[in-house]
Each structure stands twice: as C-alpha cells, then as structure tokens.
Curated annotation (Swiss-Prot):
pH dependence: Optimum pH is about 8.5.
Binding site for (3S)-3-hydroxy-3-methylglutaryl-CoA: D31, C120, T163, S211, H244, K253, N328, S364
Catalytic activity line of the entry: acetoacetyl-CoA + acetyl-CoA + H2O = (3S)-3-hydroxy-3-methylglutaryl-CoA + CoA + H(+)
Activity regulation field: In contrast to bacterial and eukaryotic HMG-CoA synthases, is insensitive to feedback substrate inhibition by acetoacetyl-CoA. Enzymatic activity is inhibited by hymeglusin, which also blocks the propagation of H.volcanii cells in vivo, indicating the critical role that the mevalonate pathway plays in isoprenoid biosynthesis by these archaea.
GO biological process, one term: acetyl-CoA metabolic process
Record GO terms (molecular function): hydroxymethylglutaryl-CoA synthase activity
Stated family: Belongs to the thiolase-like superfamily. HMG-CoA synthase family.
Active site, renumbered: E83, C120, H244
Pathway linked to the protein: Metabolic intermediate biosynthesis; (R)-mevalonate biosynthesis; (R)-mevalonate from acetyl-CoA: step 2/3
Protein name (record): Hydroxymethylglutaryl-CoA synthase
InterPro entries: HMG-CoA_Synthase-like, HMG_CoA_synt_C_dom, HMG_CoA_synth_N, Thiolase-like
Task of the protein: Catalyzes the condensation of acetyl-CoA with acetoacetyl-CoA to form 3-hydroxy-3-methylglutaryl-CoA (HMG-CoA). Functions in the mevalonate (MVA) pathway leading to isopentenyl diphosphate (IPP), a key precursor for the biosynthesis of isoprenoid compounds such as archaeal membrane lipids.
Entry keyword set: Acyltransferase, Isoprene biosynthesis, Lipid biosynthesis, Lipid metabolism, Transferase
Length: 445
C-alpha cells in the first residue's frame, strides 16, 4: 500500500520578537526565571503591522511551493487550521489561495479549500483530512497543502500573556513522502470541556489550572486508545515525542505522565523498583484519593531518577527549542515541536531514517490525538532546507511600549495607525479593507 505523509514543511515566524526575561518581566515586576525556568520561554514572536494569519500562512506556503517546484495545478486541496480567524463565513484558505495566485501561473480553481476549527488540535486534524483524502484515492495524483497559522494573543494583563506568539507552518501532504510517513493507527481522548474558549471574542477565556488537568487527562486517554490499536508503547520505541507545546513547562508534565504510563510493567519499572518502588496500582487502595496521592508521590520520585532524566533529555528536550524562542503558535505548535526535534537530530548528525516519532496533539474544548510517524530516507535534505535559525535571527526586537502598540494593532476592537517596524521584502502583506470589509493583500517584491 502506498505510504502517505508529510513531504515537506516550511515555517514563517512573525517578524518581531519580545524578550521575556529582559523586557517583559521587569515591567511586570516578575522574576525572569518565572518565564525561563517555569514556563520554559525566552522570547516570543509577534506579527508586524502588515502581518496577519493570511500573510504568514501564504508566505510559509510560497516558501514550500517554491522549494518543491510546485504550481497550483499540483495542489488539489488547501486546508487551513486556525483559531484566529476573522470571518465567520469565508475561510482563510480562500484568502491564502488568492495570495498565491498573484505570484504563480494558473489558479486553484479546482482545489478543495476549507478551514478547520478545534483549538490547537485543528492542525493535526487537517493533516488527517488530507491523509484520508489521498488514501481514499480522491486526490487525482495531486498533493494537499495544510497550513496552521495563528496569532496567539491574550488580553493584556491576563496570566497567559507571557505565552503569546505568532507564526505559520505549511506542510505538503503527499504519497511517498520525503519527510515522515503517518501511521494508520490513531488514538483519541475527547470530552466536552470549558478549559479554554473564545465565545464570540478574540481573546480567550481560560481556566489555567483546569486546562492543564484536561490536557493531561485527554493525553492519557488518547495514549490508551492508541495502544488499543497499535499495541503497547515503550519509551525505547520512539526517537522523539513531540507534544502540543503551549509552553515548554506544560510538556514537562505531559512527558512525565507519558513515561510513567509507558514504563508500567516493563523492564524499566523493574530496574527502578529498588530505587523508588513499583508504580501504585489502583486495586491496592481503598479510596481514589489515596491512590492519587500515591501516584503523585511516585511521580515526584520518578522525575528525579537517572532513567527518566536521561530519557527526557534525549526524547523530549530537543522538541522544545523552537517553541522556547517563538511562544505558542496554537495550531502550529505541535508541528514546530516535530521540526525542532528533527532539526536537533540533523545538527547532531544523527541518522533518523526509519526511526519513529510519537506525536501528541491537543486542542482545548477538548481533544487529544496520538499517532506515530516514521522518518523517511530523504528527511535530512528536507530539514536542512528549512531556514529556522535564519528567520529567528532576523526578527526585530521590540520594547515593551512597542509590544503594547503591536498588541493594539492586532486587537480587532481597536483602530489605530502605527508605522511598521520592519520593511517588507519578497512577501505578502496586508494592505487594508475592501468594499465588503474583506481584507486585501498584495505581494511586495
């Protein structure tokens, strides 16, 4: 059977950067280590005045199409995942297609276009849609373009303000992929939750503590569901495990939970028994509260063991580098975690061919999804072609006052004019509104 997966990836980061420990923390009167050690964040990307989810998505897509030598005729489907949409009817994918048609011969007249919404998991759901479309044989030999693009902003003064970010990930989904093959097996954990939502509002309403609990619960359920179809997981089976990363500190909690689950009744638990005992079993406790207290105690000890620290450093830590420098990209965050891991492998000279990733996606509301990906022989060429470091180094640093101006510019409730901080070059830019209040864009050489 023909393999289907991610043939190529590209990113586009917001062109401005805010230094969290040195610029944001002092104004907020916070200890810088709250951000660097607690949240695991150092800098956040923000969009310039002329940037938004359309320009970032279109620019990432153009980089991908140019590198792969594609034209609109090669693309049969454009799916955009976002939770930053500005129109309740017209999908962002049509805007992005319109941008791309300005610079390529031909058009996307016969490409299916849509927009996915389920908080941050929508990017992975769009991958699933593209995968199923190709597997069903409905693609007519064409590839799918999946774009995850978001401007993740919180109300000023909100506790989540430090976890903001902006950027886009473009992925080409095709047969015989050059980067990773997606597994047929998937696992889900889904419940009706109100942990993070935006009911007719731009900025989220968040129950932070509840959101973390729901994230972990749904991830556990998704992993159990995945194992029901793919068989038991084990830490040694996966070279990297990219998680949805709203901030790296959240992944520390998810990784510990995952490691405990995967090592239960394994050689690793046997090896750890003399040091921290065996994992608590529910049947050994009279009440659920007693069982949970025992689990918490076990996990507190587990995270101090050499086995866990070594595994975390090898398998999890490399997935967090890009996120620590750009912040939360919502629908794109798990996909930059994948990119971060593979980039680390390339930098280390590691041969990833045939190795597996276990990818954990999450969206508030709430749903988690687990699937595996097998790295392809041509992965290194694809990863080395993505200019992550150059893009991040080229960002323009802003002051706290500048940050507040940019926040106001991208606040849908405010109308202010601010001079751009950077000069656009060879990219799509927002130019204003049309007669029906649609957003207008053009390509600047």
């Amino acid at each position: 059977m023909t393999s289907v997966g991610i043939d190529a990836m590209e990113i586009w980061t917001g062109k401005l950067v805010l230094d969290l420990p040195n610029t944001f923390a002092p104004v907020k009167g916070e200890d810088p280590e709250k951000y660097t050690k607690g949240l695991g964040l150092h800098t956040s990307s923000f969009p310039d005045v002329y940037e938004d989810i359309v320009t970032m998505g279109a620019n990432a897509a153009k980089k991908l199409m140019d590198r792969k030598g594609l034209t609109p005729a090669d693309i049969g489907r454009i799916d955009v995942a976002t939770e930053s949409a500005f129109d309740n009817s017209k999908p962002v994918s049509t805007y992005i297609a319109g941008c791309l048609e300005q610079v390529y011969d031909g058009d996307f007249r016969h490409a299916n276009k849509g927009e996915r919404k389920f908080a941050c998991i929508a990017g992975t759901q769009s991958l699933d849609d593209a995968y199923n479309w190709i597997k069903a044989g409905r693609n007519r030999g064409r590839a799918a373009l999946v774009i995850a693009t978001d401007t993740a902003l919180y109300e000023r003064g909100d506790p989540g303000e430090a976890t903001q970010g902006a950027g886009a990930v473009a992925m080409l989904i095709d047969e015989d992929p050059d980067l990773v093959e997606l597994s047929t097996e998937q696992g889900y954990g889904s419940m009706d939750e109100t942990d993070f939502l935006k009911p007719n509002q731009q900025f989220p309403s968040v129950d932070g503590k509840r959101s973390m609990q729901v994230y972990l619960a749904r991830m556990r359920e998704a992993l159990e569901d995945y194992e029901s179809v793919a068989g038991r997981t084990h830490p040694d089976l996966f070279e990297y495990i990219p998680f949805h990363t709203p901030f790296p500190g959240m992944v520390r909690k998810a990784a510990l939970l995952g490691f405990r689950h995967m090592t239960r009744d394994t050689d690793i638990e046997d090896d750890l028994e003399s040091e921290i005992g065996r994992q608590p079993r529910e049947e050994d406790f009279e009440t659920w509260d007693d069982y949970e207290e025992a689990i918490r105690g076990y996990m507190d000890e587990l995270k101090t063991t050499e086995q866990y620290r070594d595994w975390y450093g090898r398998v999890i830590e490399p997935t967090l580098d890009i996120s620590s420098r750009v912040g939360n990209w919502y629908t794109g965050s798990v996909h930059i975690a994948r990119l971060s891991a593979l980039k680390a492998a390339a930098d280390e000279g590691k041969d990833m061919t045939g190795k597996q990733l276990l990818v954990g996606s999450y969206g508030s509301g709430a749903q988690a999804e687990i699937h595996a990906e097998r790295v392809q022989e041509t992965w290194l060429d694809e990863i080395e072609a993505v200019d992550v470091d150059d893009q991040l180094a080229a960002r323009t640093e802003i002051s706290f006052d500048d940050y507040e101006l940019i926040h106001d510019v991208h606040n849908h409730e405010k109308e202010i004019e601010v001079e751009e901080f950077t000069q656009p070059e060879a990219e799509f830019v927002f130019t204003g509104w049309g007669r029906m209040n649609e957003r207008r864009y053009e390509y600047v050489e």
